[in-house]
Amino acid sequence: MAIIITMLLMGILLGFVGAGGAGFIIAILTLVFHIPIHVALATSLTAMAFTTLSGVVSHYREGNVALIIGGIVGGFGAIGSYIGSKFGSLIPAHLLHWFTAGMLFLSAIFMFIKLIMFQNKEQSSLYKHKEFSMNYLLKCICLGLVTGMMAGSFGIGSAPFIQLGLMVLLGLTIQQSVGTTMLVILPIAIGGGLGYSSEGYLDYILLLQVLIGTMLGAYIGAKFTNYAPRMLLRFSMIMTPVLAGCMLLME
């Protein structure tokens, strides 16, 4: 029950600021509840498959999802995530804390770049105006494999990396990149979850507790997002992975 209540409170906070919670879930489970980090990674990654599903549907209805690109990047992302989960399961726990924390700090830097450099930049979608060439296809495949392996190895969603890749490499608009990132994360989470599950690291009771708390909390928190100053939301989105990384280093 303590895990559900904690995840509920965390979900409210994350839903309010609109930040990704994978790193926070890992940090809370390992630091507060002393869950082994491999189990925490498996739980966090699998939980993302459920929490992003509603986001994908919502963004698709708004027309912010590039289905073909998302399908290709996500498909190869699932392969990369499965491979990454096999690699992550071999990393000793004491080293995995450092690696995951490092990835969270790096994701904060990428989030800063996205929010500062791209947020107010008008950009036409190159995807609509150019042929789907072999070079473009290779970019999709590489983006999927790299971000998928990162997510599978370290249990984080890699959303800032995926979003920047979609904008810089594939020419999507900011709106398209947000919605398409949700679609990409879905198969990545499934692939990584299957990989960790096959290694015996997925605790289904723990997963259910995390899902109940975070999904309910995020729904409540999102209701209050419009009342927060925009600068506070941007600051919170950058500092969330930083705080999660610091918590992991305390373990």
Model regions: which residues?
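Membrane-interface helix-cap regions at the ends of transmembrane helices
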Residues: F50-E62, P187-D203, L249
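Juxtamembrane transmembrane-helix termini in multi-pass membrane transport proteins
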Residues: G11-V73
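Interfacial segments of multi-pass membrane proteins
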Residues: I25-V39, A159-Q176
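Hydrophobic alpha-helical transmembrane segments of multi-pass integral membrane proteins
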Residues: Q176-G191
